[in-house]
């Protein structure tokens, strides 16, 4: 499988994750804790790197984020 990557950003969803987190008035740490309570493995650094687009995001992580924010996965994309 070939991964298409421009060498700069590693995901497209980071800005939307940050926007949704701020709307819910959560810190990165608080968001990570909420996702952990749902049974997903996230930490503050994971959230930071996703938001900064310096980390690839797995399909399971996309599911976790969309579940927590109560949105369709497609809504995470620009």
Residue ranges of each PLM-predicted region?
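Phosphate-coordinating loops and pocket residues in cytosolic domains that bind phosphorylated ligands
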Residues: 78
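A short, Lys/Arg-rich alpha-helix, primarily the initiator
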Residues: 1-24
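DNA major-groove recognition helix of helix-turn-helix/homeodomain DNA-binding modules
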Residues: 54, 58-75
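Short alpha-helical DNA-recognition segment
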Residues: 25-49
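Residue-level signal for the short linker/turn that defines the boundary of a DNA-recognition helix
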Residues: 15, 26, 42, 57-60
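Alpha-helical residues within the helix-turn-helix
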Residues: 22, 33, 67
């Amino acid at each position: 499988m070939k991964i298409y990557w421009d060498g700069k950003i590693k995901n497209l969803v980071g800005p939307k994750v940050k926007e949704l987190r701020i709307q819910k008035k959560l810190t990165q740490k608080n968001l990570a804790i909420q996702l952990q309570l749902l049974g997903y493995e996230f930490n503050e650094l994971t959230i930071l790197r996703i938001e900064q687009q310096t980390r690839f995001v797995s399909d399971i992580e996309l599911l976790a984020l969309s579940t927590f924010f109560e949105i369709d996965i497609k809504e995470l994309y620009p």
